[in-house]
Amino acid sequence: MAKTKGLPKDTAVTPSPHLRPHTADLNRLLAGEHHDPHSILGAHEYDDHTVIRAYRPHATEVAAVVGGERHVFTHLEAGVFAVTLPFTGLIDYRLEVGYDHGGDQPHIHHTADAYRFLPTLGEMDLHLFSEGRHERLWEVLGAHPRTFETPDGVVEGVSFAVWAPNANGVQLIGDFNHWDGNEAQLRVLGSTGVWELFWPDFPVDGLYKFRIHGADGVVSERADPMAFATEVPPQTASRVTTSSYTWNDDAWMTQRAAQNPVFEPMSTLEVHLMSWRPGLSYVELADQLTEYIVEHGFTHVEMLPVAEHPFGGSWGYQVTSYYAPTSRLGTPDEFRYLVDRLHQAGIGVIVDWVPAHFPKDAWALGRFDGTALYEHADPRRGEQLDWGTYVFDFGRAEVRNFLVANALYWLQEFHVDGLRVDAVASMLYLDYSRPEGGWTPNIYGGRENLEAVQFLQEMNATVHKASPGIVTIAEESTSWPGVTRPTNLGGLGFSMKWNMGWMNDTLAFISRDPIHRSYHHHEMTFSMLYAFSENYVLPISHDEVVHGKGTLWGRMLGDDHRKAAGVRQLLAYQWAHPGKQLLFQGQEFGQRAEWSEERGVDWYQLDENSYSGGILRMISDMNGIYTSHRALWSHDTSPEGYSWIDANDSTNNVLSFLRYGDDGSVLACVFNFSGSEHSQYRLGLPHAGTWREVLNTDAADYNGAGIGNYGAVQATDEPWHGRPASAVMVLPPLSALWFEPVAAEAPVVQEPPTAPPLS
């Protein structure tokens, strides 16, 4: 702002007959409902002269400075000003806008005219978006700082673009205009429904919203669907931001592109960033979370949704700003720093992604332009009754584009290594959690959501092509076929899916008294009937430690010693079973209390001599064993990697099997689910020789009883369990033992797997 002193001299010209716009145009402009305000405002040539118009409702005076001469505008009506220039071919000019702030003279704001600039979106961008094929949509929609070279100097500002095809008008509001959008009205670009405006001098870090004049007659103030940053909730404005981050994870990204995660180790700790250690920022998490993950040997961290969400109690699963990391913990570049630090430490980063539904907040996506825009118009398809949310219209090209580009955005802009897609089952079935008569069938009369299937296939095919080496994981709780089958073979194209059947059966079994487990032995063997039908992740997730379900510790019966033994055994079983393992924060040391997003993990339990400390030490050791033994992960998805030793010893409550690696290695895993020690248990093995005890969950180091086999067993040529050799061993109660052959004594010969049990 500046005083009027020293302004260029005023120039008077006979007013043009075109000075005042047509009444209909003027009325639409004043109502905030003009589709092309640029056709009225800015500079326009008429025969031998030029008219410049400006809409500045709070100004007391407006002038245009052209070549050092000051041309004072006439106030026409309600803040609309205009001036006539006695020539054509205007090259450039600046506006001087005076505001009365109570002083002797008005304060003058010098600026370029927003309505002088051409659209910042190209025809190809608009075409690709309307076709649903703009893979870098975030580069054209949303808020983008720009710099233009003009004859009168450099102009800096921000371009804004938003999709609202049924809106009667769109205005930009923010701190820059005291949240009054009359002077900053966007234009619609052709028939695309995209509204656009470049606003000079808009500051980076400035707050903004769009005022949408909806087709339903309702005027609402909306956050930008493509916002890259936001205010800290519960505030809801979007924030202009740019990235200046320099990545330091080239080695990781190169390695990622060369690998297929399906055939690599994956031991994942699932983390809710806000409650892992409450109060930490992204920058602080970069130190503390990275150190913790590395110390305890996990290969990946999976973050509950990071995208901005207004309600903390949703844990991030009701997203309002899909392109903005939550501002609760810092800036987007600070989130990049967190990912970068994890990568530099050799840790993969997976984020939960929620394309199934979104909340109904009046300032967000719902009925965005006064119509069902992002959501399906038919409430029988467009609303998720259980969650009180809207369901995306997966059949609309622009909506699919918004979501597919969003998946790419997280993978490419933030270098995340994978997306865990939430609530896939709710997307696949039109009758999901709906009463009879409360859903509509597809074109073939079925309940499959064909549009959602097409979207998931498109998303998976696109992200895997654009970002080789990333992983997509489906939370899919039904038996939908081909979830991890490639899209060119008719599958959905996910890399992996959560094995909810394994999780439910296993947690049901370990919750039983060991005395009764013999009668439920099938719960622990059934998963092997389908273990290789998909590429599985074995989840013990946040969903299993909330809402009265208890914790792993709480599910175990008996005193603390038995509870700890049961937790250790369960985790060793999870790590040994085919599939990648995922464990929610706190369960890696047997947290006793259920999780709540309102408080942190119960770190106080980690006394060095506590049962929790023992469980965590075992996790650290077990992760080291896991990553160094290819038998535990290289054949996770094929029968070649697994063979039962004995699946049917329900009398003793013992399960045993072999895991094979693609390098010919073998690991024998045996589990005693009874509460009694078996002191003379004979186990069939592939060959004679020394078999080293790689893991004993009852070890004293883990605060177990220390019962075991002194580190090894000797296998002889006595056949047992259909194997040519066997060893007699001690099985502690509620324990898991892993054995590997001593390589110098006996080379391992890979054998074909046996059939899964039928009983």
Swiss-Prot record:
Its EC number is 2.4.1.18. InterPro entries: A-amylase/branching_C (IPR006048), Branching_enzy (IPR037439), GlgB (IPR006407), GlgB_N (IPR054169), GlgB_N_E_set_prok (IPR044143), Glyco_hydro_13_cat_dom (IPR006047), Glyco_hydro_13_N (IPR004193), Glyco_hydro_b (IPR013780). GO terms for molecular function: 1,4-alpha-glucan branching enzyme activity; cation binding; hydrolase activity, hydrolyzing O-glycosyl compounds. GO terms for cellular component: cytosol. It is an enzyme of class 2 (transferase). One of its GO terms (biological process) is glycogen biosynthetic process. The keyword Glycosyltransferase applies. The active site is at residues 422, 475. Coiled coil: none annotated. CDD domains: AmyAc_Glg_BE, E_set_GBE_prok_N. Residues 1-22 are annotated as: Disordered. SMART domains: Aamy (SM00642). Signal peptide: none annotated. The keyword Glycosyltransferase applies. Gene3D superfamilies: Glycosidases, Golgi alpha-mannosidase II, Immunoglobulins. Keywords: Carbohydrate metabolism, Glycogen biosynthesis, Glycogen metabolism, Glycosyltransferase, Transferase. Pathway: Glycan biosynthesis; glycogen biosynthesis. It catalyses: Transfers a segment of a (1->4)-alpha-D-glucan chain to a primary hydroxy group in a similar glucan chain. Monomer. Catalyzes the formation of the alpha-1,6-glucosidic linkages in glycogen by scission of a 1,4-alpha-linked oligosaccharide from growing alpha-1,4-glucan chains and the subsequent attachment of the oligosaccharide to the alpha-1,6 position. Belongs to the glycosyl hydrolase 13 family. GlgB subfamily. This is 1,4-alpha-glucan branching enzyme GlgB. It comes from Mycobacterium sp. (strain KMS). The lineage of its organism: Bacteria, Bacillati, Actinomycetota, Actinomycetes, Mycobacteriales. The gene is glgB.
